[in-house]
C-alpha cells in the first residue's frame, strides 16, 4: 500500500491517513452490529 501511495502525486499525500484507516471500517461496523445485537438480546 505504501508503494502505491508513493507513486501518487503529492496532492494525494493528504489522503494517505484516510487510506490507512479504510480497512478498519468494516471491522468497526461488525463490532457495532454485535454490540447492538447484544444490547437488544439477540432477538
Curated annotation (Swiss-Prot):
Transmembrane stretches, start-end: 14-34
Mode of membrane association: Single-pass membrane protein
Propeptide residue span(s): 1-6
An example Gene Ontology CC term for this record: chloroplast thylakoid membrane
Disulphide bonds in the chain: none
GO biological process, one term: photosynthesis
Superkingdom field: Eukaryota
SUPFAM superfamilies in the cross-refs: Photosystem II reaction center protein K, PsbK (SSF161037)
Localization: Plastid, Chloroplast thylakoid membrane
InterPro entries tied to this protein: PSII_PsbK, PSII_PsbK_sf
Keyword annotations from UniProtKB, A to Z: Chloroplast, Membrane, Photosynthesis, Photosystem II, Plastid, Reaction center, Thylakoid, Transmembrane, Transmembrane helix
Coiled-coil region: none
Family, as annotated: Belongs to the PsbK family.
Assembly notes: PSII is composed of 1 copy each of membrane proteins PsbA, PsbB, PsbC, PsbD, PsbE, PsbF, PsbH, PsbI, PsbJ, PsbK, PsbL, PsbM, PsbT, PsbX, PsbY, PsbZ, Psb30/Ycf12, at least 3 peripheral proteins of the oxygen-evolving complex and a large number of cofactors. It forms dimeric complexes.
Purpose: One of the components of the core complex of photosystem II (PSII). PSII is a light-driven water:plastoquinone oxidoreductase that uses light energy to abstract electrons from H(2)O, generating O(2) and a proton gradient subsequently used for ATP formation. It consists of a core antenna complex that captures photons, and an electron transfer chain that converts photonic excitation into a charge separation.
Name under which the protein is recorded: Photosystem II reaction center protein K
Species assigned in the record: Cyanidioschyzon merolae (strain NIES-3377 / 10D) (Unicellular red alga)
Amino acid at each position: 500500500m505504501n508503494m502505491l501511495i508513493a507513486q501518487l502525486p503529492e496532492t494525494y499525500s493528504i489522503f494517505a491517513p484516510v487510506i490507512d484507516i479504510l480497512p478498519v471500517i468494516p471491522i468497526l461496523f461488525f463490532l457495532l452490529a454485535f454490540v447492538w445485537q447484544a444490547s437488544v438480546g439477540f432477538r
